[in-house]
Amino acid sequence: MFRFVILIPSYNEEKTLKKILSKIRKYQVYVINDCSTDNTNNLKNKFLNVVFINNKKNIGYENALFKGLKILKKKKFDYIITMDADGEHSIASIKKGVNYCKRHSPDLIIGNRSRKNRFMEIIFSKIFYIRYNIFDPFSGFKIYKTKVLKKLIKNYKIKKHFFIDLLKIFIQSKMKIGSINISSNSKPKRKSKIGGIFFVNIKMIYCFKYLF
């Protein structure tokens, strides 16, 4: 029987995070609270299956994600499920991913979202698919096999674009990568946590040059 844990980096997502946590009580969950200024930390008393790791300062999504993965690779879980705190990923995606793991035992699963939110994200994904047969590299919904992740990031020092760099490591190491189609909801209309649409597009262009 595989053991699964869910990892959720979160910054000022109290309302959507609460909704998510209320629907995944059957799983062990770790939330990396990235120095939120709302009442996210108060949720720790409402969900006994959730461990809250509170950052003393805001370190950003990718650093928070890496911190969580480093913590969980030392735990006795077979797979680590990552998902976003903004409600973009449907809860049904979790069960779908779990079932895929039980049938195929992949090293990594990528959740192919039904919608993408940025023009450059769509373009990048199409090119990425042609080269690597991976449809949605920027999806925050992924499932990592813990023993493989532990080996691949043993001596890894986080880089500026960890999110795409980790995927690159899995590809170059010829790991077994699978994918599932997942339903995705529209992200709330608010300022991006990483600097707005212009800076996100610049980030994707840089990732494109870095990866190819």
What are these model-derived regions, one by one?
Residues 7-26:
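Short, well-formed alpha-helical segments that are part of the catalytic scaffolds
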Residues 64-65, 116-212:
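Conserved catalytic loops of nucleotide-sugar-dependent glycosyltransferases that act on lipid-linked
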Residues 93-109:
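Conserved donor-nucleotide/metal-binding helix-loop-beta segment in metal-dependent transferases, i.e.
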Residues 15-19, 38-46:
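Acidic helix N-cap motif at the loop->helix transition within catalytic regions
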Residues 77-88:
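Short beta-strand-to-loop acidic/aromatic patch adjacent to the donor-nucleotide binding site
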Residues 42-74:
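Conserved donor nucleotide-binding strand/loop of the catalytic core
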Residues 33-42, 87:
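A conserved acidic beta->alpha catalytic loop
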Residues 3-5, 165:
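Cell-envelope/extracellular polymer assembly enzymes that use nucleotide-activated donors
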